[in-house]
Amino acid sequence: QYKSVTYICDKRFLLVLMFVDYAVEPFYYERGVDFYANGQNYAMASLLTIAGPTLLGQPAFDNLLIAFQNGVKEKTPAAIKTLVDAARATQWRQLPEALGPLAQFAAPECLKAIANPGVDTDAALVVLQSLISRMEVMTDGNYRVEHDQSKNLLRYHELLLRFIDHDKDIEFRQTQITSIKFPLKLMEVSQVDSKASPAVQLADIMIGAAIEAANNITGLRSGGL
């Protein structure tokens, strides 16, 4: 009787996509290449996520992602050097297009992007924006969002309010099939205690079922619900 959408986010893929955005793309931009044209960034992130462990070595690839997260978080010369060393410790010559900017060149433009104070690897806002863009398409009228309590989302509360308050007509098209129009039909975003919200409890059950189904479909797990 009610419209619903279940949104599954592969956080590992999203982390790899961020790696491509900050540790790869600036190298190509500096050389006049539009790395975002035709979804090249998504293609490389997909290739790295699926084939990276095999081509680069599983432990080394895992260490690279850990070093990237730490480098983005700490932004110190030592953390950045550890990231470059981690890239060089992989079998990067198997995929030089992706790892060369760090492993071969320690490209200053990439290191500068990673050290930028405004850059982090928090996926909360990315996930919420994607979900909002989908809900905007599904809903016929105004709506509000109740979210389980999250310290990460609290960081973006003021930004979300600015999204909601934007009253000028404009459309942003992220891909051929994804766009978001302002003003939003979203009226409010609030955090609630899941223990006091049957709706959030039901959403938790749906999320668990969706994850279980996704694991079964991809072969990561069998059986389940």
Tell where the protein language model's regions lie, with residue ranges.
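Phosphate-ester processing/binding pockets and catalytic centers
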Residues: 1-225
